[in-house]
Amino acid sequence: MTRKRVLITGGGTFLGDALAAALLAEGAEVTLLVRPDKIPPEERLGSLADRTRWYTADVWNPASLKGHGRGHAVAIHTIGGMTADPAQGLTYQYLNIVSTRNVAHMCVNGGVNRMILMSAARAPWINAGYIAAKREAEAYIERIGLANTIIRAPLVYARGHPRPLFYRLMSWLRVVPPFAWIGWQRAAPMPIDILARGVARIALEDSPGKKIYYAPDLRRRNTWSERRRGSAYITQPTAASRRPIDRIDDDAPFGWTP
């Protein structure tokens, strides 16, 4: 059986690398687009540099994306920004809509069958401007007629690493009535390995059953033991990149760090 080729934007980031590892474990061929940076791509990717194809490209620069979509069945777009800085021109619209538009055009021009957008679930602790930009990005992909899947993901964390008490409480409330009945399961932070494995399995489905997926859908694509124990294939964040709770898609341009 032919291995499906999947392109991921955001190589060298917490989310991008977790998705790459999950897809490799499922038998896919993976290509990573790594944003130009002072740190060499090989160093940012670690062992993934030898297990994937990778190229340097900037999703905010359409010219750098030219030709990278060819030969791929699916493209997963992971990059955006949860923290805006309008003084530097880094609005929610620029960070999330412009990057999505550029990747969508790469997919159309390169013959990519389907684009998966890592979007965000609405939650009280998530900025409304960020959510609005994500929804506009979702609508743009649909508007241009590109087959797409939307992952409205919560915040993620690496198992075994400290998290603020607030986020631990939010994860616990996911299964406690009445919070479990009012959509909390969609918003509660989840382990990165569960999210990555769920997205990988959706990406490899020939005919996804729905257009928009939330955290409960991702959990259902993990076995009981995977949900309980996690998996060793997910690369743990380095000391330099580790955060108690991770923004789902932050990889802002111009060397800017939120």
What are the roles of these predicted feature ranges?
Residues R5, A73-V74, R114:
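Structural motif
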Residues K38, E42, G46-N102, M106-N109:
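NAD(P)H-binding glycine-rich loop region in Rossmannoid oxidoreductase-like domains
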Residues P86-E138, R143, T149:
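Conserved Rossmann-fold NAD(P)-dependent oxidoreductase catalytic core, especially the SDR/UDP-sugar
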